[in-house]
């Protein structure tokens, strides 16, 4: 078990070279295919139960990793403040849409605020999977290669005062796996210019979704799709 972990005031960069290239997009190209670095930024993976407790990430930049920028599992107490996790999560084994800027699984008491989760190449800005007692506040989640924020099987969560824009999928996706998420509040967010719905959710119970500003999400006038259906979503890659 590991307790009281603090990482702050660092830049963690996975790129191979830092000199200016002729093509400004060449670095992104090398992270998408067989030339990718296959590296993860920061990974804290618990074996069973809450193996970690009291994790704090502050003033931290994690960029240019082909795998997830930051991955945390089985933790009790996570604080992420004033961080920038950008350009992480590419098309590497085990495949696209499985690597993200930030992914947290099987954890509780999570506070994420005043941070950026932008431009994941093939993944989401932020993924919360099987988590309890969480809050995401005053964050920018933009221009990611899949959904902005993906949540699955979470309990007692708040998403407030965030900018969620320009993502290739939905701004917010509530995914159903076996029971669905419940007691989720999504309020006072600006959700705009996402390729699919602003908010889409399946099998979520006791939600409080209101006072969000929607603008030009998807191809339909409808900006939200909240379904009581309990079914898995199959994505076409």
Regions found by a protein language model. Name each.
Residues 1, 21-48, 64-72, 92-106, ...:
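Extracellular beta-strand/beta-solenoid scaffold signature
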Residues 3-16, 51-64, 76-91, 100, ...:
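Right-handed parallel beta-helix
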């Amino acid at each position: 078990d590991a307790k009281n972990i603090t990482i702050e005031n660092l830049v963690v960069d996975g790129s191979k070279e830092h000199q200016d290239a002729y093509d400004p997009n060449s670095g992104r190209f090398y992270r998408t295919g067989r030339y990718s670095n296959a590296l993860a930024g920061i990974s804290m993976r618990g074996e069973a139960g809450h193996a970690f407790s009291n994790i704090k990430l502050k003033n931290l930049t994690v960029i240019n990793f082909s795998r997830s920028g930051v991955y945390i599992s089985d933790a009790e107490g996570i604080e992420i403040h004033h961080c920038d996790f950008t350009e992480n999560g590419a098309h590497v084994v085990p495949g696209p849409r499985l690597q993200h800027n930030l992914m947290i699984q099987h954890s509780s008491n999570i506070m994420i605020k005043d941070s950026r989760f932008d431009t994941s190449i093939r993944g989401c800005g932020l993924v919360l999977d099987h988590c309890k007692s969480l809050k995401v506040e005053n964050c920018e989640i933009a221009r990611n290669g899949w959904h902005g924020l993906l949540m699955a099987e979470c309990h007692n969560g708040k998403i407030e005062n965030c900018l969620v824009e320009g993502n290739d999928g939905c701004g917010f996706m509530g995914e159903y796996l076996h029971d669905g998420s419940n007691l989720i509040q999504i309020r006072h967010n600006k959700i705009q210019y996402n390729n699919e719905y602003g908010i889409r959710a399946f099998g979520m119970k006791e939600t409080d979704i209101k006072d969000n500003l929607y603008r030009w999400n998807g191809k339909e006038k409808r900006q939200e799709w909240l379904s009581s259906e309990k079914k898995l979503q199959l994505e076409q890659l």
